[in-house]
Amino acid sequence: MSQKYLFIDRDGTLISEPPSDFQVDHFDKLAFEPEVIPVLLKLQKAGFKLVMITNQDGLGTQSFPQADFDGPHNLMMQIFTSQGVCFDEVLICPHLPADDCDCRKPKVKLVERYLAEQAMDSANSYVIGDRATDIQLADNMGITGLRYHRETLNWTMIGEQLTKRDRYAHVVRNTKETQIDVSVWLDREGNSKINTGVGFFDHMLDQIATHGGFRMEITVKGDLYIDDHHTVEDTGLALGEALKLALGDKRGICRFGFVLPMDECLARCALDISGRPHLEYKAEFTYQRVGDLSTEMIEHFFRSLSYTMGVTLHLKTKGKNDHHRVESLFKAFGRTLRQAIRVEGDTLPSSKGVL
């Protein structure tokens, strides 16, 4: 999985920039911006790696001797490290604007390797800085820029903005039998739109979203003139893939979930977002169809979903009414999924360090 990065300016963003000469060249000029350390710790826990990138005009010249820079800078780095803030890299351009070098922000020379390796999660990486050149650097890198300001966008605000979840995924799956478009928003509720061409199946999918506490949009065009097999199976595959993508790095999720009574039915659902696909399914139906949905395809749907989502899923229901039995399975799965995808912290719920 690609890595989230924060490319952070130094003077005026991490530490205060002296208005007199814009140089932190003495220990008494070193002052940290408010809340910078606790917020950076929070962002590290959320999965971001930190890269410092700074223009230091004339560094190493008579007007800004290297030794004058090194003392305060090294102390700053020692303080960051002592508090658990770790920068993967510190990138410095020492040139003056008149030098017309190729490494001065907003040029991308210093960050070329992050762009070339394609290991950066561009959609979730940011440049943070107090100047227009920082925002221009972000534009040149194809990522988002955040203009730091103590009043309008301070470190507390940045921390809240970057750790607020809005987990989303979009999957398109086209085969000779089906054309499927699935969008999932795990942190939004309501207004789900589902059209598979199988009315009862639409109703069941809506139960997953409603009881799962999330929103999804599913559009399917399938070979229903034959039967509902490909439509149901491929929808399960596409939805499972979308849920897996929306979960992202899975940090902070509860991972596990559980049981649901419905009228005369008792449905049991146990779920582990483990990365290991497996289904145990036990349900018997009196009739071959409920509405326009084949009852034999219900197990096939959950098997397809568990395979692409990478989950261990146990489903079981008992009852007297086929409609209720089917609905209890989808409701129980939705309710269990609601528990499992809920974010309660920022650590990965696995002793292995991977899910």
Curated annotation (Swiss-Prot):
UniProt keyword annotations, A-Z: Amino-acid biosynthesis, Cytoplasm, Histidine biosynthesis, Hydrolase, Lyase, Magnesium, Metal-binding, Multifunctional enzyme, Zinc
Pathway(s) served: Amino-acid biosynthesis; L-histidine biosynthesis; L-histidine from 5-phospho-alpha-D-ribose 1-diphosphate: step 6/9; Amino-acid biosynthesis; L-histidine biosynthesis; L-histidine from 5-phospho-alpha-D-ribose 1-diphosphate: step 8/9
Gene Ontology biological process terms from the UniProt entry: L-histidine biosynthetic process
UniProt keyword annotation of Zinc present: yes
Region of interest called Histidinol-phosphatase, as start-end residue ranges on this chain: 1-166
Region of interest: Imidazoleglycerol-phosphate dehydratase: 167-355
Binding site for Mg(2+): 9, 11, 130
A single MF term (Gene Ontology): metal ion binding
Catalytic activity: D-erythro-1-(imidazol-4-yl)glycerol 3-phosphate = 3-(imidazol-4-yl)-2-oxopropyl phosphate + H2O; L-histidinol phosphate + H2O = L-histidinol + phosphate
EC number, as in UniProt: 3.1.3.15, 4.2.1.19
Cofactor(s) listed: Mg(2+); Zn(2+)
Residues annotated as the enzyme's active site: 9 (nucleophile), 11 (proton donor)
A single GO cellular-component term on record: cytoplasm
Main location: cytoplasm
Binding-site residues, Zn(2+): 93, 95, 101, 103
Family membership: In the N-terminal section; belongs to the histidinol-phosphatase family. In the C-terminal section; belongs to the imidazoleglycerol-phosphate dehydratase family.
Protein's name according to its UniProt entry: Histidine biosynthesis bifunctional protein HisB
Protein species of origin: Salmonella typhi
Source taxonomy: Bacteria, Pseudomonadati, Pseudomonadota, Gammaproteobacteria, Enterobacterales
